[in-house]
Amino acid sequence: GSLAFDLSTADRSDRLNAYASFQNTARKSYYGSHQDPAAYGTTHDLTLAAGVQYVHAFSRLLFMPSELTLGAEYNYDDLADRSLGYHTRTEQTVHVGGFYFQNEWKNRRWSLLLGGRLDKHNLVKGAIFSPRVNVRFNPSESVNLRASYAGGYRAPQAFDEDMHIAIVGGERVRIRLAEGLREERSHSVSCSADLYR
């Protein structure tokens, strides 16, 4: 289920959004295709997400009209997966709290977006900062040029959907996270040119 709350001023220069959602999965599964009588198990996965976002539109900030976005988000995931026939279990609880910001300056010819997100994941030491930058330039009405950069990460955690793929193929799988794993980092760069006729 989910809930959302939206509030804005009459001119829409200030907007506030708050949201919360949850999902509860309780599943009994058999993976053996009548080949392995021990290939059965249970999964319980409770996922919660909640956040708030505030947006303010400036008629001019420094050099151009802009829109500032500030927000905070919290995610919780509690996973218990048991392969009863093999006497194995994976239990994991994840807490991720994050704050993000971005400001986008925009007019008919240019847009510049600068932003970032700071996350604290309970399975990772320290906070993780993920920046983003996007530039758009329209030298004419028929040409659109864009360039962007975004950083990201993936924490070392077991994912419910990954656990059962190999089991369906007849393999016995036991997932255990190694000590001292660090987050994976990603860097995405893109450039594009569009010509409209």
List the predicted regions and their residue ranges.
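Face-selective signature of the C-terminal outer-membrane beta-barrel domain
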Residues: 2-125
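Secondary-structure transition/capping motifs at alpha-helix termini
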Residues: 106-108, 137-142
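Outer-membrane beta-barrel signature, preferentially recognizing the C-terminal barrel domain
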Residues: 1-9, 138, 144, 148-197
